[in-house]
Design a protein with these regions (language model features):
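Divalent-metal-activated hydrolytic enzyme cores
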Residues: 1-13, 37, 46-64, 79-167
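Active-site alpha/beta core segments
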Residues: 12, 16, 23-26
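Divalent metal-coordination and catalytic microenvironments
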Residues: 18, 42, 71, 154, ...
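Short glycine-enriched loops at secondary-structure junctions
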Residues: 20-25, 45-48, 74-77
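Ordered, amphipathic secondary-structure segments that act as subunit-interaction surfaces
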Residues: 66-75
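Short, glycine/acidic-enriched capping/hinge loops at junctions between secondary-structure elements
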Residues: 27-32, 53
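Short helix-loop-beta junction
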Residues: 33-41
Length: 167
């Protein structure tokens, strides 16, 4: 709306950072009923946290004064499905950048499984949750985020029901 545009023309003041997947079915501004300037959204396949993404999160917290970080994963995630469906670990051949995404998901999931003594089979929902948990952990361990005492929450959006679950 025009009022939101005018209110944000001289700078942004988002109250929250949303780290989510680039899946077109996951639209944080719509899911959380927010407008222009309310959310600082970081999107990539699999809601992974790279150094670049972490820099964006730090920027939002340190320079835009965002008080909340939400890691929002979702069901039917293509990055997770690629990992779960890859029975022969073909991603290890690194044929393309998609394999890099699957490799990162695999590393995250295996790390969480080892820490929690979770069965080794590739369960899709378990892998989705492990992926969300891993991204949350990276953010929580960041010294800038700790220094600002930023609230961090983990959520999973169900593309079948439209419901969001806190993890």
């Amino acid at each position: 709306n025009k009022k939101s545009v005018l209110n944000n023309q001289n700078g942004q003041h988002p109250f929250a950072v949303i780290v989510t997947c680039s899946d077109s079915r996951v639209a944080p501004e719509i899911l959380f009923d927010q407008g222009i300037g309310d959310l600082f959204v970081i999107r990539n396949a699999g809601n992974l946290i790279s150094d670049i993404d972490m820099g964006s999160i730090e920027y939002a917290v340190e320079h835009l004064d965002a008080k909340l970080i939400v890691v929002l994963g979702h069901t039917e995630c293509g990055a997770i499905k690629a990992y779960v469906g890859d029975k022969n670990n073909d991603y290890k051949k690194h044929r393309n950048h998609i394999d890099d995404i699957v490799q990162t998901v695999a590393e995250e999931v295996e790390e969480i499984k080892e820490q929690k003594h979770v069965p080794k089979e590739k369960n899709e929902l378990g892998c989705i949750n492990a992926n969300i948990e891993h991204s949350t952990k990276i953010i929580k361990n960041n010294p800038i985020i700790k220094a600002h005492k930023t609230k961090i929450v983990s959520m999973r959006y169900d593309v079948h029901t439209g419901k969001i679950t806190f993890l």
